[in-house]
Amino acid sequence: MIEVLAFPTPNSVKVPIALEEMELDYRLVPVNLRQGEQKTDAFKAMNPNAKVPVLIDRSVPGDGDVVLSEPAAILVYLAEKTGQLLPKNGPHRGKVFEQLVFHASGLSPAFLQAFLVANQSSPQPEAQARAIGG
């Protein structure tokens, strides 16, 4: 059985989407970031960075549980496990990795920054006026 520890974030939703596309059975385990559940010792034993998502694959015979914590690594692991969604070689495989890296290093940090500015900073009317050309 595959378990996905997650919270409704752009990074977390990538994993269940892939699992659904691959038609793999999994169990979604909610981790409440607002209550700090990702900062517990038990969670940090799975991911010392205290971030979601975390994937636990208990279906690997003889190897014990596979525990992964970075969305791109999880997606590549699932693709290679199933032989789906990732070309075996060639330029199309490169394009998939290009998108994975873009999401990990460009898009996800930008979403986080926008969220923090919108939800955790005080209003700055002068900056807002400059941004809209006022």
What is the meaning of each model-derived region?
Residues 1-130:
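GST-like domain detector, emphasizing the conserved glutathione-binding G-site
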